[in-house]
Every structure is written in C-alpha cells, then in structure tokens.
Amino acid sequence: SLDAISNGRLELGVGLGWQQEEYEASGIAFENRTKIFWETLAICQSLWEGGPISHQGEMFTFNNIWCQPTPAQGRDLPLLFGVKMTESNAQKIAKVGHGWIPIKTSREFISEGKIILDQAFKDEGRTDSPRIRGQLPTCLDSNGIPSVDLTLKELEKSMDAGLEEIEVFPINFAQSPEHLREVLESIAEIKK
C-alpha cells in the first residue's frame, strides 16, 4: 500500500466519472456506477482495517479477502471527493470522507457546495470542518494564453468562496520547458 510506504501521507481523491463510454469499455453498466462506487468504497475501508473480510452486498459478494499491507492510517485514510455537491453527496461525504474537490472552479459553485457540505458535517455530528481543495479558475492574458500571474490574482477570491487548499498545475501555464522555471517561481511566491 502506498500509504504504508509513505508513512501515512497518502490522501485519496475519488470520484465517479461522467463518461458513459468509459464504463461501457469496462463492461460496467453506467446506471450502476453510483451503487458500485459507494459499495466499493465501503469494501476498501473495511479492507484498510485489516482482514480477512467477507462482504455480501448488492453489487459484490466475496469471502475471506485480505489487503496487505494495510494503510498506515487504516480506515481513516483521507478521502476527498471530486463530485457535484448535492445534499445526497454531502451526506455521504460527511459519513465517510474528509472533504471535497469541486469539479468546477467558479466561486459561486464552490460557495454553494461549501454551504451544503458544512451543513451535512453538522448534521452528522462532526466537529471537524470539511477540507475543500481545488484549482483556481485559469485566466488568459490579452493573447489568449493561460497566465499564471493573472490566475494567482484569483487566489483570495477563491479562498473567500470556500477553497482552503489550492492546487496549481504548472503544466497549465508553462508554454515551453524554458518557461517552466518562471511559472514555478510565480507559484512559489504565493507561500510567502
């Protein structure tokens, strides 16, 4: 397990996917994806506690299965969900997860989702706050090229909307290998 090798530093981002063709290529009925996802996640969390485990569910049935080595964090491996925030998804995340990775970068989308997820955490009796990790909206310069500097200017607004952890992918901005260093230096400045 990657979590065991990294001494408990793994954080797992999970989601259902939206492309029906991907499911069809795998021989999985698209309409069953939600059931499969949540049942699979429950199975994984049980396996992470140690085994063997047996499971008789709607989608899967098995007996005496092991997962070794178990994650250093056990069942509490941080789970961040890349889903559209709905009350149903928020309730499920509040039961088993740690946070949300918004699938859109708009501040309105993030803010509305945060309100729903915060309420679900309260309803579940949790005292911790959900983690919200996402990207800034990519801003283009006057030539239509993605600009790291303009994008980073959106940081405060996105954090005000509810993002607490920001992911910046240099590949979105570096126009050449030579440009990569400049992009990385701009990103490094936000830590100061």
State each model region's role.
Residues 1-192:
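Active-site-adjacent structural elements that line small-molecule/cofactor binding pockets in enzymes
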